[in-house]
Amino acid sequence: MFNNNNNDKINNTMMSNNPSGQIINLESIDCNSNLSNTTSIKDSNNNNNNNNNNNNNINNNINKINPNIDRKVLDDFNSKSIKIIDNKLNKKNSKKNLYSKEVDDDINKINLNKKIIPNETNSNNSNNNNNNSNNNNNNNNNNNNFNYNNNINSNNNIINNNNNINNNSNNNNNNNNNNSISLYVDTQEKSKKKVNAESLRGPIIFQNFILYTFFLIVIGTAEGTSWAPEIRVANFVPYCVMCVVLLEFNRLHKKPLLRIIFPLYTSNIPFAYMCIFSREARKYVLISLLFFASCLCIFLQSGIPDLRKHIVIFCIIFMINYGCCILFMDWFYIDTTGTKPYRGRILATKIHWGEEATILVSMALLGCIFIVLEKFIKSYARCVAEQHYQIQCLQKEKEKLQTEINISLKKLDLDTPIEKIMDILRSMINTSESENDKKQLIKVIAVLGSNKLYDPDFKFETCTDDAEVYSWLQSMLNREVGYSNVNNNNNMMMIENNNNNTIINNNLIEPTSPNFSKKLTSSDLIPRIRSMPEITDQGIQELIINNFLEWDFPVFQLSEITDGNPLFYMSYFLFSRHKFFEKFKIGIDCFKNFMRKIESGYDSTNPYHNSIHATDVLHNLNYFIEKSFGKFLTDIELFSMILAAIIHDFKHPGVNNHFQINSKSRLALKYNDKSILENYHLHQAFIIMNEPESGILLKLSDSVRKEIRETIIALVLSTDMAKHFNLVGRFKSMANSFPTTTNTQQPSSSSSSSSSTTIPTSTITPTPNSTTSTTTTTTTTTTTTNNNNNNNSNNNSLNNIINNCSSSNGSMGASGADNSNSNNTNNSNSNNQNQCGSSIFLNSNKKDRLLLMKISIKCADISNPSKPWNLYTNWSNRVTSEFYKQGDKEKESNMDVSAFMDRNKPATTKCQINFINIFVAPIYEIWSHHFPQFKLCYQNILSNLSRLEIEQQQQLQLQQQQQQQLQQQQQQQQQIHQQQQQQLHHHQQQQQFQHQQHQQQLQHQHQQQLNNQNQNQNQSNSNNSNSFGLTQSNYLIVV
């Protein structure tokens, strides 16, 4: 039994030692080295008992592969090869006993039912069955024999995949034990594409049919054409029946070899018949030689084994058949009178045996010629096959080299840029001689090896931020941010609290608004539809048209005059302005249904995340598009950005993702704590988009709808604050790879005077007094814009407003904003400013443009600090109010209150300052650097930040004063307390002195009493002694 590695070694050895197609000498194979992994067989005698079986099976399969191999040579080769293999195996079996049950199971699983073509040597197959039934151990050896034979049968495939097997055998050496060995016994077996017997075989049956038909035509035309009138047409029927019977009888044979040999040998029967009846016409010699040559030509195409032997046999049979026909004719044609019923009329010319002998010798010579021709054809075919094989080898080698060249030229580069950087740094370390440089490079590799390349390294232990800021930042990012000063005891307390509060209020899991608890129906929309003002309201017209290109768009005023529906009107305006209704086949009714459902899904009870915030984000995003990069976007990208802004906070429950995770809500479980609310917004919005009455994407093709959906998903998911730093880091890397074209050209006075978006630099001064100037300038520019636009807006319908806006400010072109009208007040500025960030878009691909779109919607979403102070304070108050509502819910659920969300510990200014410094200012700094037309936004941030810092300083001063006052009060109280303590101490001392005096008096009195008692006792004792003495004297006197 051998594994794959051993088979490959034996195959390679045989191929290398057999370049000329000679029989391989197996004694040259070193089984000690090539069969080192063989396992021992349980009973070595079984191998000796099955040598005959091996010989028979090998012979059968070799005959199948190359039927023209000499039988004697094969028998000698088989006997020698089996003996050598058995001897080698016996030596190995005596040294090793590694045959296990696993190997037995694997061997028993080998398929023993593969078909083998039988031939002359199959008579010994019954011996194999007898040996298998006598001893169960022989099953393993028989399995080996069959595998041995099957490998010989499939040696063509093994040769074709020789290189692959050699490469894969080392990998599979430890996994598979294949009990087989492959032998290569001839040059044709050595070739990778061997031409087998089937491909060398001609259409034998068809050629026999042609042969019979030809002589049939000869019979049918001999008498009619008078070239042989003695051949009667009456012979046509018996000859035809004879040929048909032979051809049909040949179809009954199931064995392919018999179906080839049978028609060749049975062709002697029609020949005998034709030879006999063509004797009278003296054409039998021509017919015999023609028939004989035709049969030999067919024989050469038969491809049967031992072709020469069959040619000799056929020649002998044919000559005997011809001689018998001559003898039969000499016996049969003897009737001279025509009266004998069973004899033929005597021949016109008698048979001359010398002439017949000459014909037989000619047939023998013709047979020898065909034998030599067969040998030559075979040698020539072998030579052609070898040349063809060599050509194929060269062709495959050429293709292999060409493939390697193509791979080297067009190799798929699977190395990431960071891997290439690491390789470059490692090579620099290896070539560097300075130890200091090596240490620095190693440090760089360690930094690059981090899995958070685009996230800042928060180290609160090295900065002045407190634990409250850390907790707030952690809740914003939904992950640990590196704060190391958190007490572990607090974490343990949180775990205990979570274990005690396992039941969470269902109100925290399900949305609290009625709009979230059930699906919107038409009846739910009726109150909103009735409460919406008329679309012909002049105030709505003027407000949108005059301010949609202003950064300080009065979104709260729009909400008031639209009765809480600002998103509907702003979306309607932008859809008409960008011609989305025509480009994306959106019906007006479908759009209205869609927008009413979307705006109804924004909970008006949320102080911040409501339709006003969605309108503000939509306006901000459109402002970025029209002021800068709109012309670089495709229609699909522009449409996707507008839709993403509309639905980005759809059905927001008023709490953040951190709350969802801590409360173990249904949404957190559904979305696996990853971008929970963002996924929820998308899911609910796409449900509405798929409804028939509100499906604004249903009329688009599948490919366009798929692209819009993918873009919307990417944009809405990018609004997750947990992805903020990664997104900013990627934008930095991408933007730094493009040259930044900063426009320093100032607009002319005429253009600046007519521009409604030009903001004087005085409005950016970060002082509290700058608000007045900002308001004044904004009012002036707004008034100018109103005057320009009111001259062109005369209709009272929203469609006329849209058309009027398109004519006055320009409509978006096929690729974005294209302000083409000469009355547009922003042309002179926007044309110059659009060049600033154009290099990024001009040199970017679709992936980079998607990153830019993500940054733009991110900036639009957190743009509150970039607004003027009056708008910013309104937004910050709303955010704080929503934070406090979340804190109240956390208290109701016995959860830890998040940072800056406890209304009992207000810290709005501190929260806003940290939000600006950590999130808003860095991204707007990069945004305005690459798009200078947005520097107003960044400088508003700096202005608001300075005011917040002033407020914080004032608050700190107030706190310090209060602390000082409190300290003074505490000091006064401490002094009074000290005085009181001193007085109390003095009083206590007096009391102690008086008490001591009193104790001394008591002790003195007590001592006097003791003395008096002692005196009295002494007196009493003396009196008693005197009385006793008198008593004794009296007694003595009596006595």
Curated annotation (Swiss-Prot):
Provide the protein name.
3',5'-cyclic-AMP phosphodiesterase 4
Q: What class of enzyme is it?
A: hydrolase
What species is this protein from?
Answer: Dictyostelium discoideum
Q: Which residues form the PDEase domain?
A: 533-973
Q: Name one GO cellular component term.
A: plasma membrane
Query: What modulates its activity?
Result: Inhibited by 3-isobutyl-1-methylxanthine (IBMX).
Pfam families (UniProt xref) = PDEase_I
Identify the stretch(es) annotated as Disordered: 40-63, 116-181, 738-835, 978-1033
The topology of this chain with respect to the membrane is: Multi-pass membrane protein
The UniProt catalytic activity note for this protein reads: 3',5'-cyclic AMP + H2O = AMP + H(+)
Question: What's this chain's function?
Answer: Phosphodiesterase specific for extracellular cAMP. Involved in the degradation of extracellular cAMP specifically during multicellular development.
